[in-house]
């Protein structure tokens, strides 16, 4: 790709996402910092990502507030976290095929950056920010609803998934396995860190997770562990 997306690339992307965005803003939304640094310091998508994160949070929070008048602030926060997290955003980005349009540097390209969850999630937020900047809040809100309303509906019926750490601790206590232990590692620049967590129960690693915060990574790891332990205990009961 050159410094700008070609007209054909712009049309193809707009048809994929279902929204029109000015080519220069769209190009910026798809420009990862690795590509920018390798091409003379072009503008990156990080400012648009910052903007899109806020727009996404606002629309999802507003929807949850209006559709769940019976829930407390804490319950609403857990619902929002189940919808707005790196894994969920990356999954939506994969469904849209955003990875093939991201402008990456050679290093990121070589290490599978087009399917890296952190890059996909960041790019989706930058895209939402671009729609807001170019088309306004109404169209940005429409895009968020189209992409995330199914996740919001699923989150409302998650049960254990609203707080995987608590659910995991309850499960391990019931199975007399002891208290889960978490180990968290971080990588990336200070303003854009990625956290990776692993969880051990009774000396055995049961799950891992990745997120933009320690809390998010631990929740993802707890989810993996909860599902693994639940499956193992169900299998043991069937065999006994």
Curated annotation (Swiss-Prot):
EC number: 3.1.26.3
Residues that, per the record, bind Mg(2+): 49, 122, 125
Cofactor dependence: Mg(2+)
Lineage: superkingdom: Bacteria
Pfam families to which the protein is assigned, alphabetical: dsrm, Ribonucleas_3_3
Gene Ontology CC terms: cytoplasm
SUPFAM superfamilies noted in UniProt: dsRNA-binding domain-like (SSF54768), RNase III domain-like (SSF69065)
Active-site residues (renumbered): 53, 125
UniProt KW Oxidoreductase keyword: no
Renumbered residue ranges of the record's region Disordered: 205-240
Domain called DRBM: residue spans: 163-231
Presence of the UniProt keyword Nuclease in the record: yes
Residue ranges annotated for the RNase III domain, each copy included: 10-136
Keywords: Cytoplasm, Endonuclease, Hydrolase, Magnesium, Metal-binding, mRNA processing, Nuclease, RNA-binding, rRNA processing, rRNA-binding, tRNA processing
Gene Ontology annotations of biological process type: mRNA processing; regulation of gene expression; rRNA processing; tRNA processing
Listed GO MF terms: double-stranded RNA binding; metal ion binding; ribonuclease III activity; rRNA binding
Official protein name in the record: Ribonuclease 3
